[in-house]
Amino acid sequence: MRFISIFLIIVALCVSSSWAFNFTDQPNSFRISGTGCGSGTTTVYFSTDGRCNSACGGSIRIKGEGNNVPNQQFTLNDYSKNVTNCSGTSNVASFRCPALVNTTSPTFTVNVGNSAYHVTCQYAQVTETPAGNSADKVAVGIAIIFGALISLLAL
């Protein structure tokens, strides 16, 4: 009986730590791609300092607007070295999200200059940790872990 109790406590520890700290998260990166210069929604959008093709030679700013997105701006300087074609017909880039952005959201339509792109990236909520987990979720997970450890010592 004691062995079963210890086994169940260890299982609870593993499950709660995985749930609290989300060990199975994918890397916080994404890809954007598109063709030509089109249009799209601006709930979350990328903008450049000039026309559509200026992204090839410069940096990109990611800026969030709307009710659910903080009005903050980040500069992603590594975009230009990942562009495969600067003619505006087939620009593809991959880069890491800023610290306050995670990849758990649905795909948004965004603009890079005047080009329409899709990206799987969103701003994290204020209460989220850099890993994208809420502070409450992490606190509850830690409490479960400590409770299980105390139970192990009591056996």
From Swiss-Prot:
Annotated lipid attachment (GPI-like-anchor amidated asparagine): 133
Organism: Dictyostelium discoideum
Propeptide residue interval(s): 134-155
Gene: pspE
Residues of the signal peptide: 1-20
Keywords annotated in UniProt: Cell membrane, Glycoprotein, GPI-anchor, Lipoprotein, Membrane, Signal
Protein's UniProt keywords contain Ribosomal protein: no
PTM notes: The GPI-like-anchor contains a phosphoceramide group, rather than a phosphatidyl group.
One GO CC annotation: plasma membrane
Protein name (Swiss-Prot/TrEMBL): Prespore-specific protein E
